[in-house]
Amino acid sequence: MANQEKVEAVALLKGKLEEKNNFILACYSGLTVEEITGLRAQLRKEGSEMKVLKNNLFLRALKESGAHKDKNISFGPEYQGPLAAIFAKDNLPTVAKVCKDFAKVNKNLIVRAGYMDGSVLDANGVEAIAGLPSREQLLAMIAGGINAPARTIASGINQIVASLARAIQATAEKNNA
């Protein structure tokens, strides 16, 4: 790769890192083109994207990008070989779940690491995040939790009114008899 191409590749990766500052690193060795295309389509549905990397260029882009500049991120020996970065904005748990589900079917996709909100994650950390509910599910849970006490109070008030109505009805029937 010529020097100018490397500079352009680093600039492209820096742009991706600043736009979508969370990512997962995965080894894709052994996947067919069709399998990679299928994974990319699933990731696109979640607003994410997958880029095949040159490891040294990605490390350089990490060190130069704004959000990751002060972080001590490096590739150990477990990160050697063909890697792809799967970029995500706010939905890394959902993207991690897509990768986990894909890896169950295609054993050649191996998640190596991840980065979420300033924290470097190992493969186990990414797998743990895949088990978290999505942002939408969390919001629904919060809304349900907020709504539950109001629903209980409304039900209690309705029961009091219904009991009062039954008591008035019983008194009216007793007086008429």
Swiss-Prot record:
An individual GO BP term: translation
Coiled-coil annotated spans: none
Keyword Isomerase: no
Protein name: Large ribosomal subunit protein uL10
Role summary: Forms part of the ribosomal stalk, playing a central role in the interaction of the ribosome with GTP-bound translation factors.
GO CC annotations on file: ribonucleoprotein complex; ribosome
Any Pfam family: Ribosomal_L10
Origin superkingdom: Bacteria
Gene Ontology MF terms: large ribosomal subunit rRNA binding
Family, per entry: Belongs to the universal ribosomal protein uL10 family.
